[in-house]
């Protein structure tokens, strides 16, 4: 059964005409990303040649996807909107709350028991408001979306930063916060700054141990975690033909680590085959009928530099297997360099655990190729040195992989098969170790490797690679093992070499599954009741934030001046805190607990200016709030890098933090702050960051003249009586300023 088929038929019936009208209006050929964007304008009569990276544009996405950790807050907000049902097709996926411990057989029932209140809430909200519900164990959101919902030429938003995964099948798929999702769910325009376009030209063909994962790991080394901010990466070139749809999805998935709005590949025969193999032949036919507009125009391909803002050249034949890390996904290292780089940087060289899975690399092809490496270790008599953990991407993949013997290949070398869920990738991992503070190395096929992310240990050095390389390094137990050149010893002491991985793109017998774990939207929702206990410590109804009082912000205490990388993991930690994602008051206790205090070098320890004592960040914020005092956070570059979790914006707002002043922001987080009525401001001169002192009282003036393009003034009153003043800037437009004045975007929408 093809889900939401009527919407898809309607979309394709008008798509090509919409693109042709766009070309006639802007009077030039279009890139593929532009075609999709222009075909989804909220008001097509407003179509014009928008200024990339400058103008905000209103769009009308086709659908919304939500995962269980972020869906709670999104749907709590939606419930306040007064709607009977969602305006566009939507789905909820229960994948983030399942803890990996001893294996799927025990872990899944335990998760269903532990999270029953949240699952029941999400299920009932989904039934009441006509939302598709994928229960615990059904799979990871982005793999399930790729298998069931993604379609060429479409536009989707999702409350998860790796939503761009669907770009592998030709979608503009963008990670957003819950408030953005609510805009789409209620039929309002969804606002996005018109993205810049980065063209990535792929030529040649991957070979040996090189994989699509290594392509994006190499690009991360080139562009860094900020290089894609407010941009779409559009891939083109002859190299595309040799990369499968799931391989392309992997590349698009980790575009999130570049800070990109999304990434996209054009429709091709690989996409056509993927649609047919996943039971969506009618969509394949519809896409073929629109094929000429599901790729960039020929004139663009003839002269790419005239149409893209930047070009990145990648020769696939020269791509090496990579290990990126530790602690940041853009620290790119070809595996051939690790023998020198590892010791030089004092990396722990023993690989203790290898983890295969995540939304980035959990497809059938990923598991099949990784299993071919595991099978060699078993057949060649190689003793496996590390622990191997596997998370399949969906129940359909798990069932098919088990039928085809793939999971047995892993089990034969001692691998542990976890639930079809995020697990360790999002910090949901009960790691069995002798010392959870010890310096050690793990290798994963995941997407992020921030300090403490996987297991909570700040001394775990996490490196990102392909599933194939992850298995090879786990077998060898060494970070510097190069499977292309190095040998291992079998049980008789003979030197043996691992052959390059192989594996089917699709299961030869086709995909199979007994129960996908899906509950379809129901039209019979009149008697569905959504109950939230007032005594719950996991779910809490939301109260509107207060509107701006019309005054400047004066004499604010500094809550924290953060030093270095401050991701959404640092601002609102996941792992054990995921259970409070539906309870704003409780989860606010983790505010900025991972951020490093620039004055002490310590985490979660700041000076409470009311009594001079050093306390947890949330404790200081609550003390200020109790006295009716607003506070401010000062930060460095790319503040809010990482996930789309809007809790990282809602928590400071809840605790009366009014301003985040940073050197620069990550795209999603900046939008989330604006949506919650906060002020996300940047230094005009980044050196002014150094003027901020621990005991400062900080004032922000000029808010009565707050307007697009205007500058505001920050004044620092130092403890010694001296002062510093400097200008700060912002990216707010008129609508976003209205959100601030109303107290939040939801407040503003409610007033309209």
Residue positions per predicted region:
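Short glycine/threonine-rich loop-to-helix capping motif typified by GTGT followed
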Residues: 47, 147, 151, 243-249, ...
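Terminal amphipathic helices with adjacent charged low-complexity linkers/tails
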Residues: 42, 46, 51-60, 74, ...
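Acidic, glycine-rich flexible loop/linker segments
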Residues: 488-505, 670-739, 746-749
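Non-catalytic terminal/interface segments that mediate subunit docking, oligomerization
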Residues: 76-80, 306-401, 405, 523-659
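Mobile "lid/hinge" segments at catalytic clefts and subdomain interfaces of large enzymes
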Residues: 3-4, 68, 149-284, 382, ...
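Long, structured ligand/cofactor-binding scaffold of large enzymes
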Residues: 8-11, 15-195, 581-633, 638-640
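Extended C-terminal subregions enriched in glycine
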Residues: 379-429, 435, 643, 649, ...
């Amino acid at each position: 059964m093809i889900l939401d088929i009527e919407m898809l038929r309607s979309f394709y019936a008008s798509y090509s005409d919409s693109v042709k009208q766009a070309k006639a209006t802007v009077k030039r050929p279009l890139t593929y990303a532009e075609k999709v964007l222009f075909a989804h304008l909220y008001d097509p009569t407003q179509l014009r040649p928008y200024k990339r990276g400058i103008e905000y544009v209103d769009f009308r996405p086709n659908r919304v996807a939500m995962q269980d950790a972020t869906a709670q807050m999104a749907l709590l907000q939606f419930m306040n909107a007064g709607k009977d049902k969602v305006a566009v097709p939507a789905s909820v996926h229960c994948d983030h709350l399942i803890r990996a411990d001893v294996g799927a057989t025990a872990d899944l029932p335990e998760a269903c028991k532990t999270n029953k209140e949240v699952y029941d809430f999400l299920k009932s909200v989904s039934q009441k408001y006509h939302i598709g519900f994928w229960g615990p164990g059904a799979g990871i959101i982005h793999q399930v979306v790729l298998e069931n919902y993604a379609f060429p030429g479409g536009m989707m938003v999702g409350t998860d930063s790796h939503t761009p995964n669907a770009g592998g099948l030709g979608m503009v798929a963008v990670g957003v916060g819950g408030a953005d999702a609510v805009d789409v769910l209620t039929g309002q325009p969804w606002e996005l700054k018109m993205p810049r376009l980065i063209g990535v030209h792929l030529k040649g063909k991957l070979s040996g141990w090189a994989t699509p994962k290594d392509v994006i790991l190499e690009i991360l080394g080139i562009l860094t975690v900020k290089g894609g901010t407010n941009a779409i990466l559009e891939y083109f070139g002859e190299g595309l033909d040799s990369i499968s749809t799931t391989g392309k999805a992997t590349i698009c998935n980790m575009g999130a680590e570049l800070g990109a709005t999304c990434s996209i590949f054009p429709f091709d025969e690989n996409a056509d085959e993927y649609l047919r193999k996943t039971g969506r032949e009618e969509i394949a036919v519809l896409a073929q009928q629109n094929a000429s507009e599901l790729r960039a125009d020929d004139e663009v391909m003839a002269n790419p530099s005239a149409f893209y803002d930047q070009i990145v050249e990648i020769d696939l034949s020269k791509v090496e297997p990579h290990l990126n890390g530790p602690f940041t996904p853009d620290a790119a290292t070809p595996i051939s360099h690790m023998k020198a780089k590892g010791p030089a940087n004092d990396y722990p060289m023993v690989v203790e655990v290898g983890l295969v899975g995540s939304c980035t690399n959990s497809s059938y092809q990923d598991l099949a190729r990784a299993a071919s490496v595991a099978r060699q270790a078993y057949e060649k008599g190689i003793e496996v040195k590390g622990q191997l953990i596997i998370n399949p991407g969906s129940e359909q993949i798990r069932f098919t992989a088990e039928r085809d013997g793939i999971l047995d290949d892993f089990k034969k070398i001692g691998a542990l098969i976890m639930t079809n869920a995020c697990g360790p990738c999002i910090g949901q991992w009960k790691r069995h170790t002798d010392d959870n503070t010890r310096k050690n190395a793990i290798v994963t096929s995941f997407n992020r490797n921030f300090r403490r992310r996987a297991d909570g240990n700040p001394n775990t050095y996490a490196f990102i690679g392909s599933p194939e390389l992850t298995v090879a390094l786990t077998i060898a137990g060494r970070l510097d093992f190069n499977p292309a050149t190095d040998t291992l010893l079998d049980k008789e002491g003979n030197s043996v070499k691992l052959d390059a991985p192989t594996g089917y793109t699709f299961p030869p017998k086709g995909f199979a599954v007994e129960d996908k774990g899906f509950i379809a939207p129901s039209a019979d929702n009149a008697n569905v009741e959504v109950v939230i206990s007032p005594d719950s410590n996991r779910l809490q109804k939301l109260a509107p934030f207060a509107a701006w009082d019309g005054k400047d912000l004066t004499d604010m205490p500094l809550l924290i001046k953060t030093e270095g990388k401050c991701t959404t993991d640092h601002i609102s930690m996941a792992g054990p805190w995921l259970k409070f994602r539906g309870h704003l008051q409780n989860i606010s206790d983790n505010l900025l607990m991972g951020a490093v205090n620039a004055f002490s070098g310590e985490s979660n320890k700041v000076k409470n200016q009311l009594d001079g004592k050093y306390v947890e960040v949330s404790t200081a914020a609550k003390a200020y709030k109790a006295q009716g005092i607003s506070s401010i956070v000062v930060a460095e570059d790319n503040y809010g890098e990482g996930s789309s979790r809007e809790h990282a914006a809602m928590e400071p707002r809840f605790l009366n933090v009014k301003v985040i002043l940073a050197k620069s922001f990550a795209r999603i987080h900046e939008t989330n702050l604006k949506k919650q009525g906060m002020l996300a401001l940047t230094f005009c001169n980044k050196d002014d960051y150094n003027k901020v002192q621990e005991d400062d009282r900080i004032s922000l003036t000029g808010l009565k003249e707050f307007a697009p393009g205007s500058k505001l003034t920050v004044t620092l009153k130092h403890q010694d009586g001296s002062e510093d003043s400097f200008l700060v800037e912002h990216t707010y437009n008129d609508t976003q300023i209205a959100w601030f004045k109303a107290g939040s975007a939801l407040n503003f929408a409610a007033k309209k």
